[in-house]
Amino acid sequence: MMDKEVVYIAELDADVDDVVAAHYLHNKGVLKCVVLDPYPKTKEGLERKERLESLGVTVLKKMPPIAKYVFVGGALTLVADYIRMHHIDWLVMNGGFVGTNIATYELDKFKGKETVRTFNFNCDVNATDTVLKADERHIGHIMLVGKNVCHDIRNTQSGIWNGDEYKELFSKYHVKEEKRLHDMLACHEGIAYINGEDTFCEYDVVKPYNEGLCGTMTKWGSTKTRTTPYREVLAAVGYKKS
């Protein structure tokens, strides 16, 4: 269904999460290319870039001419620019937050919170602002897998990632047992949802909102009732009961 059509936007400096997610997409046979946004500055980030290239992955500094499915583990700077003249069918992103006003299950660290800071959104808040306001002519669907599910203990090797097919990938990158696999979760969910397969999470239609743009300190949440300048998105609200 999505044979080598996923453009993955990666931030390779922060930790191993993005490179594992990119490798996962490559293993699944759905990866078209990796676009670096922001471009890595650290030794580790540049090594991760070389590692992807050694797998035969195309690694770019800018968006390719056609990007039907865009999965995001980095910033939205290049996407915001791209959609001025191009269309994306599905934008799937590790980002955002569904809080106490909507989520039935809350993690202790977010109990009672409706908004939190979220890394990928805040890499470039103006770009995020643009993307979340884009209409269907520019982006057909937006799917957000946010902090409320990413930080869950289930998002680890002892939880949903305990299958044999993941072991080799995790050992290759020395992924710790308790490491939350934020970007890999978003990638898995995007592939599964678009292909009509089983997702790990439950989804609901919400609108993102913030408490005012404030650079990297911007706090984001989701709403079904309040007025917001942003469009409706599909957001992960919790894990399915197993």
What role is predicted for each listed range?
Residues 2-242:
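N-terminal acidic, glycine/proline-rich low-complexity segments
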